[in-house]
């Protein structure tokens, strides 16, 4: 698959990667059609998702079955009047349907806004208003539903509310019932035109240092930007069973359990749980023979407190971490207990993986790795001049004639904030680092 999108697909060194990473960019690229449906045609029986939960349930879905489900879901969403450029907010925790709906919305050109289940009424009204949200698809969690219902009278742009219920629970007033309705939709017909590469595909609300959250808008090439996340940072292949610990309301979900993993042809493993418990997580990894794992350092800290000798983790091949600084002591203890060196990475909601430790490198505890070759990264002083080695500075992305694949397109409806972060040929991350 990746040979369709990269001129060179294998690299043996940092120098090789930096020199030869080059994307093949199709016109009007759409991840749902050009990657997922392509896998369905090429390897329909290959497992795409292995979803499990803390109630002992599991769902195994092949690429072929996932195409059928996403087509059906896309058709259903169309019957509700949802189409190109319509913003749709998803509050779905780790429910299986999140993966189906994400792809279905991509197929009809709608704008997906994943959101956390912790939002209050105020948060929901703010998002609905700022993004002109047209529909909300949510879990049947009583708190989530209550906050959405409280926001209804102050959300005039929202025309459809859809809930995904569990085991026959009653449908909240004012909501469509996903389970009983989506399979009744007519056969899906792909729209004649869905998107250009520059159209907005995905938006995240991300908190700033002050004020209300920013709306980070990504185009359709953002998905391709995560090819390097899954294939090179996570080091995935077609035999991989990959687990990333992340709620679907945050950007880490598309980093770790969606785009890059499926570019690699891997199987996405999901553990849907209400409360984190290291022992339960480790038993899931043992039971299903997870081969690749990614989580924030905090999760690893909980894991190394367990007696890891109790678990058969012999299937585990590769581990990565991002989201916060990795304490070298955690790195050392995990390596001591498992023989696996964690490969750290760095990025933002505004980017894909910007810095990373790649398979052809020996990880250095306390280091985020090297710049990802799809970005031109530098460290600069407050006056804009480059930092010397060992000198602390701001991480910036140099932007040439064309925006790098994976970098956000704008802060939606906020040109002033966009200019503050993106000027003089640089995207300013606001994050500080030093180079050895």
Protein language model annotation of sequence segments:
Residues 45-103, 120-125, 178-180, 221:
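Conserved AMP-binding/adenylate-forming core of the ANL superfamily
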Residues 388, 396-436:
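Conserved ATP-binding/catalytic segment of the ANL
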Residues 224-244, 248-291, 306:
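Conserved AMP-binding/adenylation subdomain of ANL enzymes
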Residues 179, 263, 290-295, 304-364, ...:
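Gly/Ser/Thr-rich phosphate-binding loop
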Residues 67-72, 183-188, 216-237, 251-252, ...:
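Conserved structural elements of the adenylate-forming
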Residues 44-47, 162-169, 174-176, 182-205, ...:
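Conserved pre-ATP/AMP-binding loop-to-beta segment of ANL
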Residues 59-64, 193, 201-225:
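Conserved AMP-binding A3 loop
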Residues 103, 107-180:
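Structural core segment of the AMP-binding/adenylate-forming
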């Amino acid at each position: 698959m990746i040979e369709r999108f990269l001129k060179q697909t294998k690299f043996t060194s940092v120098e090789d990667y930096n020199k030869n990473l080059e994307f093949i960019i199709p016109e009007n690229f759409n991840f749902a059609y050009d990657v997922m449906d392509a896998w369905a045609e090429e390897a329909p029986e290959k497992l795409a998702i292995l979803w499990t939960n803390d109630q002992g349930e599991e769902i195994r879905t092949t690429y072929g079955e996932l195409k059928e489900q996403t087509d059906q879901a896309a058709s259903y969403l169309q019957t509700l009047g949802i189409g190109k450029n319509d913003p749709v907010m998803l509050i779905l925790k780790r429910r299986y349907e999140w993966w189906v709906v994400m792809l279905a919305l991509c197929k009809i050109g709608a704008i997906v806004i994943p959101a956390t289940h912790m939002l209050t009424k105020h948060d929901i009204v703010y998002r609905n208003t700022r993004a002109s949200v047209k529909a909300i698809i949510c879990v049947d969690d009583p708190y989530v539903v209550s906050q959405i219902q409280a926001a209804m009278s102050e959300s005039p742009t929202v025309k459809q509310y859809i809930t995904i219920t569990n085991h026959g629970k009653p449908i909240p007033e004012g909501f469509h019932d996903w389970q009983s309705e989506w399979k009744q939709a007519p056969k899906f017909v792909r729209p004649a035109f869905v998107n250009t590469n520059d159209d907005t595909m995905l938006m995240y609300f991300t908190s700033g240092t002050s004020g209300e959250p920013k709306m980070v808008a990504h185009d359709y090439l953002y998905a391709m930007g995560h090819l390097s996340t899954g294939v090179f940072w996570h080091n995935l292949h077609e035999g991989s069973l990959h687990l990333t610990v992340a709620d679907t309301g945050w950007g880490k979900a598309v980093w770790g359990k969606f785009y890059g993993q499926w570019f690699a042809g891997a199987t996405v493993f999901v553990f849907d749980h209400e409360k984190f418990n290291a022992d339960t997580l480790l038993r899931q990894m043992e039971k299903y023979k997870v081969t690749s794992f990614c989580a924030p350092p905090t999760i690893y800290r909980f894991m190394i407190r367990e007696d890891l000798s109790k678990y058969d983790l012999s299937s585990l091949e590769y581990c990565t971490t991002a989201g916060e600084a990795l304490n070298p002591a955690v790195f050392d203890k995990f390596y001591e207990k498992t023989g696996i060196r964690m490969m750290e990475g760095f990025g933002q909601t505004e980017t894909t993986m910007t810095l990373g430790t790649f398979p052809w490198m020996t990880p250095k505890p306390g280091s985020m790795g090297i710049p990802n070759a799809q970005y031109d990264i530098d460290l600069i002083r407050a006056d804009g001049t480059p930092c010397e080695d060992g000198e602390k500075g701001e991480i910036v992305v140099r932007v040439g004639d064309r925006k790098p694949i994976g970098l956000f397109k704008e802060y939606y409806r906020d040109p002033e904030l966009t200019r503050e972060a993106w000027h003089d040929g640089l995207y300013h991350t606001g994050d500080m680092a030093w180079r050895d």
